[in-house]
């Protein structure tokens, strides 16, 4: 057995931060008081008076629940769902957007970089904004003043934080923030706009967002910023790469410390509106697959950060991967609920990870609900690399994704020649299971950095304490290739002698017929009972287009992207991009109760809302999907498709 994460390592760099050495709640609370953790650590349970009826923010609300308390559409009548209306999104990239509905108006983005206001009951266009350029692809934010006189949509637009009047679509001219203005010294001359697909979050009168960061060695740190929504003034900033003297600074080399970057919250995050805590999952320190130049654990990379949403003060953290070499960043918004364990009610935050684990913490304190062990892992043989000797392994719940890929797992549905090439590959590469480091001869990573789960792919049912995860099975071959470009070496932060940069081309082991290398199922839908941590079901998520044409079912959609939404009607709505199907499942069993064939992929998150006493479900549709299989017909137009029960 491995050793608990709370023992044997510096509490400043391992496990759950300064709380790691505490075993009793009294000691834990004392440690919190000394180092700035939330005063609510020993307080009463939060009331959790969340509004699950509306859908006025990305993923439904700032709590990111992807849950609706509406139950007009339920397990009994869902089979009668029909298309109520659709709205064309225009030519261009497929929509990955999660619509919001506020004060009887739906807001969506279009392919030409505009925001459209729609009648949510009919899809009739009310207006289009004058915005041009790229807008955050996944979502936008709604804010209004206390008296409701000032109503704004806040979003990223070509690297600027912009706002438009939610009634008219006109720009608010005296509000604009260039994210480059917040870059630390040494990075302020970045010529390109800082743009991300992460929509950020509104909390009270602040807009919180992570600075974008590139994937190269010279990337700037993706600090987390908060801006006053009325004035655009910077109200606080949190350094994701700690500066000298800050907590976690010793997890980085002293040399070139100010030049290290990354640690980007590229996906999405959650704000608990009652506790006033922002739960922010972070990405990898740069570069993604080689860290010889950055010895140490590299806080706050690959961490769930609990920050005071009003001040930016760190309350607690947990690092899920030390010194990441696999691009195993945390890809989705943490989920909130209250569970009952050993007779006690615990308000938890739940984080699903790319490498297939589910991490569960008391969200007030950061204490793990189930033990997390530090276990020895394979070590790097790459020149100059300093891989971590151990990594955190949750002892419970069980993983939702496969974490190994061997010769026995080769896909039998790919050509024999491809199968033989894979067998030969296994004889030469490193393949020692999860956390096999990248190498010069190539290393298998399973699930790879595009496997496991991703943005928008988790949901909760807070009434039944269920947690849902959509995942995909995509092994990767990580091969380090020396990068001899002089400019790369010159710009590489170098925390040690004799270090040279390496490049790791993406190799998802896609085969000649367009299928992944691993045998089906290619994707799963997993449901957990969070009171016990047990898996309720783990079932294939959708179908493979190619195999379905051959009469083979139950293979799972290849690389679905976009998320589920649970409802009080006992349903789980989820689209599967590869087979172009939108389904309603029984949330308790996973059984398909209704499905609708679309003419294009679904890659966004559905929105569930009610207008005029009628419940609707809207899903963005467009494109052929990620890693589309060969032979599928050309996709239909980009659009938003809305379903409802027949009008009375």
Identify the function of each model-found stretch.
Residues 76-90, 115-135, 147, 161-191, ...:
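Extracytoplasmic/lumenal domain signature
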Residues 61-69, 92-96, 116, 288-289, ...:
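Short, solvent-exposed loop/turn elements at domain surfaces
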Residues 391, 395-476, 484-485, 498, ...:
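Long, low-complexity segments enriched in small/aliphatic residues
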Residues 216-219, 243, 260-267, 316, ...:
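Beta-propeller domains
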Residues 1-14:
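N-terminal secretory signal peptides that target proteins for export/translocation
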Residues 55-59, 92-112, 134-160, 192-218, ...:
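Repeat-blade elements of multi-bladed beta-propeller folds
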């Amino acid at each position: 057995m491995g050793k608990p994460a709370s023992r044997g390592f510096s509490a400043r760099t391992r496990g759950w931060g300064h709380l790691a050495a505490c075993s009793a709640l009294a000691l834990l609370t004392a440690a919190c008081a000394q180092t700035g953790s939330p005063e609510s650590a020993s307080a009463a349970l939060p009331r959790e008076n969340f509004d699950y009826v509306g859908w006025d923010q990305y993923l439904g609300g700032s709590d990111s629940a992807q849950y609706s308390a509406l139950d007009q559409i339920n397990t009994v009548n869902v089979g009668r769902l029909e298309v109520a209306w659709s709205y064309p999104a225009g030519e261009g990239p497929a929509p990955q957007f999660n619509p919001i509905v506020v004060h009887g108006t739906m807001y969506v983005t279009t392919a030409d970089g505009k925001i459209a206001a729609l009648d949510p009951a009919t899809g009739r266009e009310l207006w289009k904004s004058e915005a041009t350029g790229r807008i955050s692809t996944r979502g936008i934010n709604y804010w209004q003043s206390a008296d409701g006189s000032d109503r704004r949509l806040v979003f990223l637009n070509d690297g600027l934080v912009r706002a438009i009047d939610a009634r008219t679509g006109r720009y608010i001219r005296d509000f604009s923030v260039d994210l480059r203005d917040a870059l630390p010294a040494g990075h302020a001359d970045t010529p390109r706009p800082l743009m991300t697909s992460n929509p950020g979050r509104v909390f009270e009168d602040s807009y919180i967002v992570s600075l974008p960061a590139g994937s190269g060695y010279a990337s700037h740190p993706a600090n987390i910023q908060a801006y006053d929504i009325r004035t655009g003034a910077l109200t606080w900033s949190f350094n994701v790469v700690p500066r000298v003297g800050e907590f976690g600074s010793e997890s980085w080399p002293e040399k070139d410390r100010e030049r290290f970057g990354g640690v980007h919250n590229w996906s999405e995050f959650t704000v608990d509106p009652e506790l006033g805590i922002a739960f922010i999952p972070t990405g990898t320190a740069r570069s993604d697959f080689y860290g010889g130049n950055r010895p140490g654990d590299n806080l706050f990379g690959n961490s769930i950060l609990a920050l005071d949403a009003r001040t930016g003060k760190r309350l607690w953290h947990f690092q899920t991967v030390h010194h990441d070499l696999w691009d195993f960043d945390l890809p989705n918004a943490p989920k909130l609920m209250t569970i009952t364990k050993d007779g006690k009610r615990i308000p938890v935050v739940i984080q699903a990870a790319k490498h297939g684990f589910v991490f569960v913490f008391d969200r007030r304190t950061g204490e793990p609900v189930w033990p997390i062990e530090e276990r020895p892992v394979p070590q790097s043989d790459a020149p100059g690399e300093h891989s971590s000797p151990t990594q955190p392994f949750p002892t419970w719940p069980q993983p939702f994704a496969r974490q190994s890929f061997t010769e026995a797992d080769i896909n039998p549905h790919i050509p024999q020649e491809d199968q033989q090439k894979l067998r030969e590959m296994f004889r030469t590469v490193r393949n020692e299971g999860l956390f096999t480091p990248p190498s010069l001869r190539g290393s298998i990573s399973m699930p790879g950095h595009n496997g496991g789960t991703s943005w928008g792919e988790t949901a909760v049912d807070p009434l039944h304490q269920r947690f849902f995860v959509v995942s995909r099975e995509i092994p990767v071959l990580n091969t380090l290739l020396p990068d001899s470009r002089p400019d790369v070496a010159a710009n590489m932060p170098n925390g040690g002698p004799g270090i040279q940069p390496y490049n790791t081309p993406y190799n998802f082991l896609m085969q000649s017929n367009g299928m992944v290398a691993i045998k089906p199922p290619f994707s799963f839908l997993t449901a957990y009972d969070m009171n016990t941590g047990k898996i309720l079901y783990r079932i294939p998520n959708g179908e493979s287009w190619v195999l379905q044409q051959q009469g083979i079912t139950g293979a799972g959609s290849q690389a679905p992207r976009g998320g589920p939404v649970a409802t009080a009607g006992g349903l789980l709505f989820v689209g599967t991009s590869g087979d172009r199907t939108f389904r309603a499942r029984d949330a308790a069993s996973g059984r398909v109760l209704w499905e609708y064939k679309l003419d294009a992929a679904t890659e966004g998150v559905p929105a569930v809302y009610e207008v005029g006493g009628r419940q609707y479900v809207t899903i963005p549709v467009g494109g052929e999907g990620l890693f589309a299989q060969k032979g599928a017909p050309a996709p239909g137009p980009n659009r938003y498709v809305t379903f409802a029960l027949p009008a009375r």
